[in-house]
């Protein structure tokens, strides 16, 4: 009886492991292309178009540093939908309607994320309490719409599906950007997998990665910390924050939390866009455990500030952007109480995924699955072998028994 039960448990464990490994190979893939300034040879402005085709649909990601740095996510239920750009209108003071998807009726969902400001504050007590810091300790915020941006043309890599958007605050009177910059590194994916660089985010073909970098910028104080302000756009309903916890910290030691920003639309008949990240940033390019900087998400709030009308959000959504859509702002601050300040390495890196559908779920690696299988399977195997040995010995004893007359 015990032997049969042990075999069943061992068989069940094997099926679970095989199922977990097979499940990794059944995830969808897309044909992904990356194009710089489609339809224009002008390299003084940046529009990067990522087109991901497959499964009867197309996901368009449009990144740009025109006006406020922005990424558009547009989902269509057609594999032939195309981005059309009216460059004359896009570069004019009234860009509304300069970006569109053809055929227009194929669009089933569109959203945008704008990167508006970088805050720098003096953490005099080393508490990393961004929201609780008095206003007098804040330096003037960096408005990213005022930055000058390098041409991304030389950074476009059609093979690795990546590009860099790098900018400087040329009007800063403190000359903090003399040897420094702010960058957005873009990476697209044609299939599921996991990044090789920290924080080793798990991705699917339905998302792209954003890496926000502050490198070499001279802080305006010895105990400076930073925060990034972003604005989301949603037509139906608002956004909501979700915290997803895991028991596994294999890829990001000591970090067990994944944060997600998703639409709060429980009655929606179709999927929506998402922003997902681990609650961690890094204070060094090496991205090791010693470089970890926990990051904190601050509550969503209505965005009532008028941002420059030159962004691609205006170019796509049009004049009714503020009236017909929900605009919400939120901040992510970087640092931990009693931790190192930015000035130590003058480097900050934070990564997130922007995508459509269900956010990727973190999972155990094949190595961990094998270790678990060995750890759980070995005792079962020993139990089975032990049961067989004991049964065999008992049978031998009984077979050699000779009754005494």
UniProtKB/Swiss-Prot annotation:
Which positions carry the signal peptide feature in this UniProt record?
1-25
Question: Is the Isomerase keyword given for this protein?
Answer: no
Residues listed as glycosylation sites in the UniProt record: 55, 86, 125, 129, 143, 153, 157, 164, 169, 179, 206, 222, 267, 304, 331
- Topology in the membrane? Single-pass type I membrane protein
Any idea where this protein resides?
A: Lysosome membrane
GO biological process: one example: protein stabilization
Membrane-spanning intervals of the chain:
366-386
Q: Which family does it belong to?
A: Belongs to the GLMP family.
PANTHER family the UniProt entry points to: GLYCOSYLATED LYSOSOMAL MEMBRANE PROTEIN
Outline the subunit composition.
Interacts (via lumenal domain) with lysosomal protein MFSD1; the interaction starts while both proteins are still in the endoplasmic reticulum and is required for stabilization of MFSD1 in lysosomes but has no direct effect on its targeting to lysosomes or transporter activity.
Q: What is this protein called?
A: Glycosylated lysosomal membrane protein A
Q: Which organism is it from?
A: Xenopus laevis
